[in-house]
Swiss-Prot record:
Subunit structure: Homodimer or homotetramer.
Subcellular location: Cytoplasm
Origin species: Caldanaerobacter subterraneus subsp. tengcongensis (strain DSM 15242 / JCM 11007 / NBRC 100824 / MB4)
Keyword Zinc in annotation: no
Name used for this protein in its record: Polyamine aminopropyltransferase 1
InterPro entries named among the record's database cross-references: PABS, PABS_CS, SAM-dependent_MTases_sf, Spermi_synthase, Spermidine_synt_N, Spermidine_synt_N_sf
GO molecular function: spermidine synthase activity
Gene: speE1
Main subcellular location of this protein, as a coarse class: cytoplasm
Length: 277
């Protein structure tokens, strides 16, 4: 008998993968968690029925949400990651030699615990001494810390359940206060094929708060529509003005200095979504 996992990406769209084995299923205080071993994408993390990351393509998302803002900033030392309990973003942040401290604010300890056990290639850096793990509400943490971080990475789930508050103007304004005078925020902002209205709304909120707001893209095969957007707000540095020849070569599988520059060249329909008044 064949076992398949199907994600309902939209009322008219589903995505299925063939499963070898169910490794863990857990009802946490916040969500339903499952880690499955699939034939095509290796082990996959699923939260509330939505695929979050896979061993085969996770590097695209994690490299792009991290290296674009960190190489835009001139000297990132303190980095806050909100969400991201699988540890992939932490792993990528620690490839930057300037980083002295990473705070991971994850509301659900079960994500961290199960990722450490079942997703070791993704969670491999969570025990690094530079990492501080804060189990709790990332919004509350941001509101309690002012002028403390160089980069804030919003590595959230989709805008449902515990992540809803991470897609609001109040939150983005609180992050502004949490950042230092040359700080940068980057947030994953969903698929332009599915969440066009949400992307436009977020773009407007960022533009009201951050002097420099830019959008960039990457291709993540297991995410809805495969094309994924990220929105960056910066107090000082323009990511498109980075001298790509000065970006040091680090060990990556997707990100390169050339990709850094190319990611800001948006398809017209995506640019229209971000620019619509």
């Amino acid at each position: 008998m064949e076992l398949w996992f199907t994600e309902h990406q939209d009322e008219n769209l589903r995505f299925s993968i063939k499963v070898k084995e169910t490794l863990v299923v857990e009802k946490t205080p916040y969500q339903h968690l499952a880690i499955l071993d699939s034939y095509q994408f290796g082990r996959v993390l699923v939260l509330d029925g939505i695929l979050q990351t896979t061993e085969k393509d996770e590097f695209v998302y994690h490299e792009m949400i991290v290296h674009v803002p960190l190489f835009t900033h001139k000297n990132p030392k303190d980095v806050l990651i909100i969400g991201g309990g699988d540890g992939g973003s932490v792993r990528e942040v620690l490839k930057h030699s300037s980083v002295e401290r990473v705070v991971l604010a994850e509301i659900d300890e079960a994500v961290i615990r199960n990722s450490k056990k079942y997703l070791p290639t993704i969670s491999s850096a969570l025990d690094d001494p530079r990492v501080e793990i804060m189990i709790g509400d990332g919004i509350k943490y941001v509101n309690e810390h002012k002028n403390e971080f160089d980069v804030v990475i919003v590595d959230s789930t989709d805008p449902i359940g515990p992540a809803v508050g991470l897609f609001t103007s109040d939150f983005y304004r609180a992050v502004y206060e949490c950042l230092r005078e040359d700080g940068i925020i980057v947030a994953q902002t969903e698929s332009p094929f599915i969440y066009g209205k949400l992307i436009n709304k977020i773009s407007k909120m960022f533009k009201e708060i951050y002097p420099i707001t830019k959008a960039y893209i990457a291709t993540v095969p297991t995410y809805p529509g495969s094309l994924w957007t990220f929105t960056m707000g910066s107090k000082k540095y323009d990511p498109e003005e980075v001298d790509i020849n000065s970006i040091p070569r680090i060990q990556t599988k997707y990100y390169t200095p050339e990709i850094h520059k190319a990611a800001f060249v948006l398809p017209k329909f995506v640019k229209d979504i971000f620019d619509e008044v």
